[in-house]
A protein has these predicted regions:
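Short, conserved catalytic or adaptor-binding loops enriched in Gly and charged residues
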Residues: 77-81, 152-158
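Glycine-rich, charge-decorated loop segments at or immediately adjacent to ligand/cofactor-binding or catalytic sites
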Residues: 48-53, 142-153
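Active-site/ligand-binding-proximal alpha/beta "capping" segment
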Residues: 92-138, 182-184
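A charged, well-structured terminal subsegment
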Residues: 100, 104, 157-184
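Acidic/glycine-enriched connector segments
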Residues: 26, 49-109
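Glycine-rich beta-alpha loop segments
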Residues: 1-68
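Short, acidic/small-residue loops that bind anionic groups at enzyme active sites
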Residues: 64-71, 108, 122-148, 157-158
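Short active-site oxyanion
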Residues: 39-42, 133-134, 161-163
Length: 184
């Protein structure tokens, strides 16, 4: 399924709680604008918080924002900044769609959903089911979180090298554009 011809999609993972005016929301909004300005289409879960903010930023910058929503949340309204909504049945189908159609992944601060999304992509990278799709973890909390995971789970040291890290959204987009063209 072609989402929008001529665009590569970046899936952005992040929490559903940040509201407009809060730092995390504003950073996600900036990320969406930077990705759109660089020529990328933005994909997210399509609802509130970081998902809304990244869609808002992309849409206000003239870009494309795709929300991959879920039938199990039919009572929730998708955010108003989406160029297109793609409805999936549940979390599993949403993640399948995002991992199949995104050509890169950026993870911001979030909760269990963000950790699940990041972990799935990480596992797919580790097992070789995702190739040439970079994942950038944004924020200074990721390294200590991953060090804690390394101390408690059985994970090979080289698997921690599958990520790219960025302290800011500006750095994340600069890193992405240096290794990954927005054009297919």
């Amino acid at each position: 399924m072609e989402l929008h011809e001529g665009y590569r999609a970046v899936a952005v993972f992040g929490g559903r709680h940040p509201a407009a005016g809060e730092r995390e929301y504003e950073q996600a909004c900036k990320l969406g604008a930077l990705l759109a300005a660089a020529g990328y289409m933005v994909m997210s879960g399509g609802y509130s918080g970081v998902m809304e903010a990244v869609s808002r930023g992309a849409s206000q910058a003239g870009g494309i924002a795709v929300g991959v929503t879920m039938e199990i949340f039919r009572g929730l309204k998708p955010n108003p900044f989406l160029s297109r909504e793609i409805r999936t049945r549940d979390f599993f189908h949403r993640l399948e769609f995002l991992t199949t159609h995104a050509s890169a992944f950026i993870a911001l601060r979030g909760g269990m959903g963000t950790l699940t999304e990041m972990s799935l992509v990480w596992n797919m990278m580790q097992t070789g089911t995702i190739h040439d799709k970079p994942m950038i973890l944004v924020g200074d909390f990721w390294r200590p979180l991953l060090r804690s995971i390394a101390g408690h789970l059985v994970i090979r040291p080289e698997d921690f090298g599958l990520f790219h890290y960025a302290d800011t959204v500006d750095e994340a987009v600069a890193r992405l554009t240096s290794m990954h063209s927005p054009l297919p």
